[in-house]
Amino acid sequence: MNNSVREPTRGRRGSPPVADAALSVNPPLSVVLAGGGTAGHVEPAMAVADALRALDPQVRITALGTSRGLETRLVPERGYHLELITPVPLPRKLTGDLARLPLRVWRAVRETRAVFEVVEAHVVVGFGGYVALPAYLAARGIPRVRRRIPVVVHEANARAGIANRVGVRTAERVLSAVPGSGLRGAEVVGVPIHATITTLNRPALRADARKHFGFTDDARVLLVFGGSQGAVSLNRAVAGAAEDLAASGVAVLHAYGLKNTLELRTPEYGEPPYVAVPYLDRMDLAYAAADLVICRSGAMTVAEVSAVGLPAIYVPFPIGNGEQRLNALPVVNAGGGLVVADADLTPGLVARQVVRLFSDPAQLAAMTAAAARVGHRDAAHHVAKVALDLARAERDTASGRSAGGKP
């Protein structure tokens, strides 16, 4: 196993690392990021980790996760230390399912407290999901027994999940991606996303990006993707519209998913390219090459697409609590995109909408500008600064407690 990943501590009360004399007076700030499970929880945490390190190169960053999540791969790849705890799968609503998991919750909380002690945590930043709940509970103190650790809650979705609804009860700061998350006192900051996206200059990179994918400089490019696994309904609808799109001079860059296949017609000579790939490992180039996007509306997707100023046709995932539609509404209401129900997505609709937008440069330009206005490029920096401010205050308070001989 990667030595930057450590298994659950099972309640071990570990001794903090011995600091040298220079650091004992003013030890490094220690931040724990609780955002495991799906990419929607892990990627914002990693974006904040990068921002923390940019603001304070000496900061100690610990990611909290489980052996079941994507964090076991993504966190070490980004160069950060990962501590594993017992998974606590959560129901999407407050039901009896959670009440039947007291032992698992207790075990995860105990393991998390041990992590906090070992890394001498000054602040916990939670991003929701089944890793965040034990972190929020473990951060609660007991007077004269165990110190309380400040908590920052970040909610990426338009409708908050159960973990974050629990976390806000004792959080010092509550941050959200969009208004109306249901979390009291939430400050809207956007979704933390990777610096390769937030610093992307699409016009400057466009020529190289289009050359990379085989498009001409003056091509009209439609980008299609359904997340890392693709989306079958998007694949069928856009592939079915290929002939009409080609006839209208629209080139397509289509990421159809690693587990999917895509049936395409044989293109006619001279038609715009239809570039189909299982996965795009350079989303910055894909965004720079595109003029319009068809995609799902997960929180990370909406955040990235709007941050780079791309107009989009959002097709919310039809299963769940409707949060994907809500994620897209701020951009759509601002004029930066459209929402199409998954059940309504047909080849005919794709052809009509895409051709209509490409035939109206003024509207496409207005949508581009609107998307850019709504997009947040500084969310990771904002969350990191909030965390460091709280961590610094906690470190100073802890130093005062130690000097006064108080627990």
UniProtKB/Swiss-Prot annotation:
Any Pfam family matching the protein: Glyco_tran_28_C
Kindly state which keywords UniProt assigns to this record, in alphabetical order. Answer: Cell cycle, Cell division, Cell membrane, Cell shape, Cell wall biogenesis/degradation, Glycosyltransferase, Membrane, Peptidoglycan synthesis, Transferase
Q: Per the record's keyword annotation, is Transferase included, yes or no?
A: yes
One GO BP annotation is: cell wall organization
**Membrane topology value:** Peripheral membrane protein
- Major location category of this protein: membrane
The segment annotated Disordered runs over: 1-21
Q: Would you say which domain of life the source belongs to? A: Bacteria
What is its pathway?
Answer: Cell wall biogenesis; peptidoglycan biosynthesis
- Residues annotated as binding UDP-N-acetyl-alpha-D-glucosamine: 38-40, 157, 228, 324
Q: Does the keyword Iron apply?
A: no
**Catalysed reactions, as listed in the record:** di-trans,octa-cis-undecaprenyl diphospho-N-acetyl-alpha-D-muramoyl-L-alanyl-D-glutamyl-meso-2,6-diaminopimeloyl-D-alanyl-D-alanine + UDP-N-acetyl-alpha-D-glucosamine = di-trans,octa-cis-undecaprenyl diphospho-[N-acetyl-alpha-D-glucosaminyl-(1->4)]-N-acetyl-alpha-D-muramoyl-L-alanyl-D-glutamyl-meso-2,6-diaminopimeloyl-D-alanyl-D-alanine + UDP + H(+)
| Compartment(s) where it occurs, according to its Swiss-Prot or TrEMBL record | Cell membrane
Q: What is its EC number?
A: 2.4.1.227
Q: Which GO terms describe its cellular component?
A: plasma membrane
Molecular function GO labels: UDP-N-acetyl-D-glucosamine:N-acetylmuramoyl-L-alanyl-D-glutamyl-meso-2,6-diaminopimelyl-D-alanyl-D-alanine-diphosphoundecaprenol 4-beta-N-acetylglucosaminlytransferase activity; undecaprenyldiphospho-muramoylpentapeptide beta-N-acetylglucosaminyltransferase activity
Family under the similarity heading? Belongs to the glycosyltransferase 28 family. MurG subfamily.
Show the NCBIfam families listed in the entry: murG
What the protein does comes down to: Cell wall formation. Catalyzes the transfer of a GlcNAc subunit on undecaprenyl-pyrophosphoryl-MurNAc-pentapeptide (lipid intermediate I) to form undecaprenyl-pyrophosphoryl-MurNAc-(pentapeptide)GlcNAc (lipid intermediate II).
* Name of the protein this chain belongs to: UDP-N-acetylglucosamine--N-acetylmuramyl-(pentapeptide) pyrophosphoryl-undecaprenol N-acetylglucosamine transferase
Q: Which organism is it from?
A: Mycobacterium leprae (strain TN)
